[in-house]
Amino acid sequence: MKPDSIILDIDGTLWNSTPVVADAWNLAVAENSSLPVRFAAYDLTQLFGRPLNAIADLVFPSLEEKERYALIDACCEQEHAFLSASTQELLYPGVADTIRKLSKSCPLFIVSNCQSGYIELFLEKTGLSDCITDFECPGGTGLGKGPNIRLVMERNHLHAPVYVGDIEGDRMASAEAGIPFCHAAYGFGSVEKPDYVIREFSELLTLFSC
């Protein structure tokens, strides 16, 4: 079935914010704990895409649950400040131009496993707010990516969307939502048997014409 819309992931699909976020998290950990934990950008590529509490469980296992979740919240707060102030080009090549072109004929949405405010920050930083019809995240609903995809579908009366993401968890969320998955192979992870593959974001223009 021809797609009637495209739902997008952010990290590893639209941009790579890991160099900036690593610096932010390192400062937050140093200021809010005595843990000897330091993050490199690559470390975050292996963590992004998971729910934040799951990331906290992985990287701060020595802390009590309440403390580790408070620390990941501090990391996210510092991350927001660092990203807001950053002048680095974080978008993958061709993303802004492709989104602007696609949005003229195809409704575009974002569903990401992120904290509240992250998608809004992304849209503000990139100037793409007017191209995105709707978005959702666990920070807004408390739901996982699959249910959030379904929520966006129901809210916007979508019948045949495709989800574009970069890791196996994105494929699994698409399957949970009952929609096809397109793997952004330039991103952070490998995927088992995606329905579609793009090696540059601009390939969406020829792959899908809603």
Language-model features: locations:
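Asp-based, Mg2+/Mn2+-dependent phosphohydrolase catalytic module
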Residues: M1-D4, S116, E120-C210
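N-terminal helical cap/lid subdomain that shapes the substrate entry/recognition surface
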Residues: P3-P93
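Conserved phosphate-coupling serine/threonine residues in phosphotransfer and NTP-handling enzymes
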Residues: T13, S112-C114
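Short beta->alpha linker loops
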Residues: V20, L47, L90-G94, C114-Q115, ...
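Structured helix-beta-strand junction loops
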Residues: R50, K104-S105, H159
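Short, acidic loop-to-helix structural element flanking the phosphoryl-transfer center
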Residues: A81-I110, G146
